[in-house]
A protein has these predicted regions:
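Small-residue-rich segments of transmembrane alpha-helices in multi-pass membrane proteins
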Residues: 68-75
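A residue-level signal for alpha-helical anchor/packing sites in multi-pass solute transporters
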Residues: 15-16, 50, 100, 104, ...
Length: 143
């Protein structure tokens, strides 16, 4: 619940500041924005809880998170199109959740393509949520 509330505030701030300070247009497909925001938050929250069991202490958490997330950011098309990447990296990116969050949000905000146009992204994100939730329930323990 905290992750979703935090995401709602952040998304609202980015949209409002982007619109009024930088003349960015409002999203073209609000329902798709909502769906992909929620799918992204829930998938990454579940994966975060699952990963938390492997982190030995608070001091090392940033190193573990960065080791997992920074490569994901660079191969998933966060900063540039993945079309110029080698086929191997594109294939890896297609299997990972961030690429599909980016595609869904980009469709909702920029192109107006909705959830039906990104059904593969929905399937991939639901699968990552399910895997993360399963791993979290199976192995996470409060100690």
């Amino acid at each position: 619940a905290n992750a979703v509330a935090n995401a709602v505030v952040q998304i609202a701030l980015v949209l409002v500041i982007g619109h009024f300070a930088y003349d960015v247009t409002w999203p073209q497909d609000w329902p798709a924005l909502l769906v992909f925001s929620l799918l992204g938050v829930t998938a990454f929250a579940a994966l975060g809880v699952a990963l938390a069991q492997a982190i030995p202490n608070f001091d090392s958490a940033a190193a573990y998170v960065n080791a997992a997330f920074l490569p994901l950011i660079f191969i998933s098309g966060t900063f540039y199109s993945t079309s110029g990447e080698p086929a191997v990296l594109r294939g890896i990116a297609e299997a990972l959740p961030l690429k599909h969050v980016i595609d869904g949000l980009s469709g909702a905000i920029v192109t107006g393509k909705g959830v039906a146009d990104h059904w593969v992204a929905v399937v991939v994100l639901v699968a990552w949520f399910a895997a993360g939730a399963f791993a979290a329930v199976r192995w996470f323990r409060w100690e």
